[in-house]
Amino acid sequence: MGLWLRALKAHAAFDTGVSAMNPPEGDDRKSLLVDYVLISISAVITVLLTVAVVTDSTKLWLALTSLGEESAYVVLSIAVLTLIDADAGVASLLAVIASGSLVIWLKEVFALPRPPEALWREPAEGYGFPSGHTQVSTSFWSLLSLKFRRVGLAVLSVAVVAAIATSRVGLHVHYVRDVLGGIAFGLLVGACVWALVVGPGRRFLMGSPVNRVALALPVLSVVVSVLSFWEGYAYGFDTSFKLGGLALSLLAYPLLAQRIRVLSHAPATVRVSGFIATTVVALVLTEASKLLAEAVGIWVYGPAYFFVGLTILVVAALTPSLILKRL
């Protein structure tokens, strides 16, 4: 019970910037270790990228491009939500939702073609500009970099985005202009989400007492996604439904925020347990939604991903009470 009470008080550390990513001042060793780990991961990614460029290996390009796939964002967002900072985790999901919704619309506005299909090394659909993988990854990583202001995280962000962007060109599904456009729009979305949700506008839009997630961003994502479908766009039908459902599920976050913040400031074993449980449930549900969509229709992605998002929040919220009360 003592651990439970201490963890309950710990969520207040959000307003001081204290988290697993930002250790308390004076804890220089832990801070340096975090940067060292992040930079080491960046080095591994950079080496793999270099080898891919030199060998032009399709397998390596596919491995690097997987860093920008849907499953990667599910795992990474849950990791931030449960292990580091609950509000930052939700903000990262909002960045993915906003950027993913916007790129569907941008592709139709610019209507620029991809490289010839005969050159493709993996299946692709829709127009080429901007690169969706590149834009969404840039939004996700730039938001986290702005939030935590760590050198190691900034280095990792650059390495991941560079790897994803280069892999899209290496797989011949995008031109260089496409990935550069994705980076530009991704930075814009990441900066806007940071400013509105975790930066200067947070107090105004979210409400300082409970740190409510700005309602405007999920609503905007739903509107853009639905419009992309109503306009008969040739790209992004399934993605539109997924993003819309996920965005609506995040409206429940203000109701569960305090409990989820307890998890992100709980002892390491509790946080890891929460991360594993939430990730397993989320991945199982997303795979189940694919089977259901094949049997019923792509529209089912909307309610399915609403359920996925809501389940992520509920599991993360329940983990502290299920574990800490037994300690």
PLM feature segments, named:
Residues 3-73, 87, 103-126, 260-262, ...:
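N-terminal transmembrane-helix/juxtamembrane module of multi-pass inner/ER membrane proteins
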Residues 76-82, 142-146:
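Generic transmembrane alpha-helix motif of multi-pass integral membrane proteins
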Residues 80-99:
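Interfacial segments of alpha-helical transmembrane regions
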Residues 72-80, 249-253, 315-319:
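Hydrophobic transmembrane alpha-helices of secondary-active transporters
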Residues 35-36, 77-78, 152:
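Short, flexible segments with low predicted structural confidence
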Residues 60, 90, 100, 104, ...:
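Membrane-embedded catalytic cores of phosphoryl/pyrophosphoryl-handling enzymes
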